[in-house]
Amino acid sequence: MERQVLLSEPEEAAALYRGLSRQPALSAACLGPEVTTQYGGRYRTVHTEWTQRDLERMENIRFCRQYLVFHDGDSVVFAGPAGNSVETRGELLSRESPSGTMKAVLRKAGSTGEEKQFLEVWEKNRKLKSFNLSALEKHGPVYEDDCFGCLSWSHSETHLLYVAEKKRPKAESFFQTKALDISGSDDEMARPKKPDQAIKGDQFLFYEDWGENMVSKGSPVLCVLDIESGNISVLEGVPESVSPGQAFWAPGDTGVVFAGWWHEPFRLGIRFCTNRRSALYYVDLTGGNCELLSDDSLAVTSPRLSPDQCRIVYLQFPSLVPHQQCGQLCLYDWYTRVTVVVVDVVPRQLGENFSGIYCSLLPLGCWSADSQRVVFDTAQRSRQDLFAVDTQMGTVTPLTAGGSGGSWKLLTIDRDLMVAQFSTPNLPPCLKVGFLPPAGMEQEVVWVSLEEAEPIPDISWSIRVLQPPPEQEHAQYVGLDFEAILIQPSNPPDKTQVPMVVMPHGGPHSSFVTSWMLLPAMLCKMGFAALLVNYRGSTGFGQDSILSLPGNVGSQDVKDVQFAVEQVLQEEHFDAGRVALLGGSHGGFLSCHLIGQYPETYGACVVRNPVINIASMMGSTDIPDWCVVEAGYLYSSDCLPDPNVWSEMLNKSPIKYTPQVKTPVLLMLGQEDRRVPFKQGMEYYRALKARNVPVRLLLYPKSTHSLSEVEVESDSFMNAVIWMCTHLGH
């Protein structure tokens, strides 16, 4: 019988990609103030922000759309769009004032290389104020990221709080003629006489930053803008050893609450790392005193003030251990100064019970109107669901469990009106609203669609639960299972001719959930089945599962993926002679392990910024702690090369299995990757070339670890499918 013909002509694949990549992604939503009509009806506006790939401009564009939600206080009466979408250019951050009468916007303007930042205040139908932050020179660029960045209105709506890079002193050469002062001594010439005078010899002084995707972000400061006067103050009192972020105004505007990350003795990469030592602080605006509000030996993130301004909820994690773990939800009472753990770490899921908190950030709006419950989304095995937590009782109640098995994301909740996103592997994101029911009735949420997406035809999906064989059980953590999401063409002419692409996720402590993902959907439309494996160590399955992997990378995770592949091939009867691998970062690490340890299984391999040699990565990555911890050791900032540790790192690395590799490999590397430097992939490229294994390398000069820029993402997809089609055969 002839093998199934894949959609493999480049022009056909490009046309398919062009169509599917137009699906927009929701990035944010906020709710306007409640309006009562002259007839007594009540409504609120929903302002949403979206991103979409633009293949003509080769960039991600951002646009907004408004909706109206009419309601009767506890249910939605009518909801619909208010006009068409409008592209928003240059907006970095935006935030409505507490009353909803004003809006602050951080905007960049100007040509590339000469961009300036402006902070604008809008009121009704006009721009009330605009401040050229770049020209004022009080600080460096404003942080717009979700790690440190914030834009917070004071409760009085007279001041704005934000985070920016500390202003760096000017520097110049010792031989800068115009700066020489022949009357001064050597000491006087080397020191600035006034704050703005340049320091000689500091032109090439190294400034640390916070690693991958945080280039030039190293020394954040808290800044306050007085809207009336236009005066900007850089707050004092923050400890010298701490980098502040995620700040908001304390009750009564008496000061500022912020999360502070330790940057001594040096900074480590912070993106996707919830384990960086940090704590909660309060800095008094009158006296400049700084007070510690939480345990300073752990890691905290996303403090959120309750509507009654009495409580602060935040997430807490252990520090300097695996990057992503099961977290605690903590509550700090502003007036009693007592902290309690509302939701603790869950070692193991029992039946259908809650398996723990794995999100790295709480939504900016997460409190119920009565300041008693907190709503958030988190992975639960291979799904992502919404939950409500009673902060007094500690009870966790699902809001979206059951149903069609897709995944949810909370965008915001305000006065109990929730705005959420829902999607599945064959359904792009839908925008939904619903009221949070009274306590005890949470599972009765009635969701109303504001923006409905059309399901992508001819794609079906399911979740497979997998139990490792007895010989692969973990000695300490016995009985752990794991899952895989299988996405496949709905009605292939002959299932035995369907090729399969195996996709292990990166991290390793992350997970795939049953949400919309462009790449698996594309592969499925081309005729492939896609197997997304949540091996033991993935988030969403309890803390025991996460702790089972450090010290066992390169073996336990590899065996889990291979076991999933063999089980699915056996049950689904796909074409076992046409199986490919596609993985990035730790997923690339696993892919390279699999073609070395199981060379007969895989006919093609595509890897993006893979970890190849943990030992050689140690000295160049922004996360050296990852190398040590995942190899099974404890990390400390003063650790030096140890032959035993490095030997273990090498033994757990894919480079060890290179002699067995015969699968054709396509490497895709970002030259600006700080997480897994591209030299890792180069090391593998040379090793394969020396052994005459078919290998191709794509090096993207300005791309980072995720290879997510539109031009890079689209090019890498096309090259990946052509590589797989070529080496698996049509």
Curated annotation (Swiss-Prot):
Job description of the protein: This enzyme catalyzes the hydrolysis of the N-terminal peptide bond of an N-acetylated peptide to generate an N-acetylated amino acid and a peptide with a free N-terminus. It preferentially cleaves off Ac-Ala, Ac-Met and Ac-Ser. Also, involved in the degradation of oxidized and glycated proteins.
Keyword Hydrolase: yes
Domain of life per record: Eukaryota
Tissue-wise expression: Expressed in lens (at protein level).
Biological process, per Gene Ontology: proteolysis
Catalytic residues in the record: S585, D673, H705
EC number: 3.4.19.1
Name listed for the protein in its UniProt record: Acylamino-acid-releasing enzyme
Pfam family of the protein (one): APEH_N
Molecular function in Gene Ontology: omega peptidase activity; serine-type endopeptidase activity
Keywords associated with the record: Acetylation, Cytoplasm, Hydrolase, Phosphoprotein
Source species: Bos taurus (Bovine)
Signal peptide feature range: none
Quaternary structure and partners: Homotetramer.
Catalyzed reactions: Cleavage of an N-acetyl or N-formyl amino acid from the N-terminus of a polypeptide
Location relative to the cell: Cytoplasm
